[in-house]
Amino acid sequence: MYLRAKNNTKMTYQETITYLFNSAPMFQKIGSAAYKEGLENTIALDNHFNNPHKNFRIIHIAGTNGKGSCSHTLASVLQAAGYKVGLFTSPHLIDFRERIRVNGEPISQSYVIKFVEEERSFFEPLHPSFFELTTAMAFRYFAEEQVDVAIIEVGLGGRLDCTNIVNPDLSIITNISYDHTQFLGHTLAEIATEKAGIIKSDTPIIIGESLPETKSVFLNKAINMHSPIIFADEISSKYEDFEFELKGIYQQKNIRTISHAIEQLQAMGYHISEDAIKYGFTNICKTTGLMGRWQQLQDNPPLVCDTGH
């Protein structure tokens, strides 16, 4: 049942968020029942908004772990290089608006309210999932904000994820592990096949960590799509030894993935100086609002927050 504001008055921000949570199935709240296979709703929403994702360049990131760290770091570096950057990630920790940012600033409450109020007569009959609706909101917002480039994080899997309507400059798959096996498959090769669905024709793909069970999956898909492929864990990068703000040994793998991504973007004509990389690497949280990556909340007693899973 859809929530309406009392007396048909304009909804507040909190009422709007409650409406979204109640009306659009959300994976974090109800689990597998929220998952909708297929891109029909996404395409319908995108067409309704005149394909906003075609108005800016895109970097598309999938993987079991490390998507958030890689997404925020690349956004930080590109912002430091002078680009206006959209950032779409999930889930949020505190406020829904964390999911959609431009140059580190969350989408405004007023925009969220306006989007829902103006467009719900169209999307209610579609019964979109929470993530389908959020993705449509992000793409439209980035187009209206005239971002230069957007970092788009996959929600679940890749092949059938609603972000997979994009044609990016660069695709990244951070790693493969067992997660969401009820949707993606029960072997690493099956999961890799789903995530390899983001590999686009003639578009470079970076694999952060490869495994014997998954390497051939990625390699074969890249060959079939005529897409240059880089296995980041097999080749050193000239930026991987730069100082990095995010702590934890596991971040070393992300750094190499990010470094190769930067090199690929530079080769495509993105203007990214070493100074921008150094600043971006050491000011990720300040620049993008990233939280929960081995984040020390207090010293005495030590209290650390990390969202790793």
Identify the role of each PLM range.
Residues Y2-G63, C70, S76, A80-A81:
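Short functional linear segments
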Residues I30-L39, A44-N55, A80-V166, L184, ...:
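ATP-dependent carboxylate-amine ligase catalytic core
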Residues L74, A138, F218:
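Aromatic/hydrophobic pocket-lining residues that form π-stacking "cages" and hydrophobic walls in ligand
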Residues L74-Q79, F142, L265:
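Hydrophobic alpha-helical packing residues
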Residues V85, I205, P228-I230:
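Hydrophobic beta-strand scaffold residues
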Residues V149-V154, C162-I172, S177-H180, E190, ...:
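Nucleotide phosphate-binding/pyrophosphate-handling subdomain across enzymes
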Residues G158-L160, N167-H226:
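Conserved catalytic-core segment of NTP-binding enzymes
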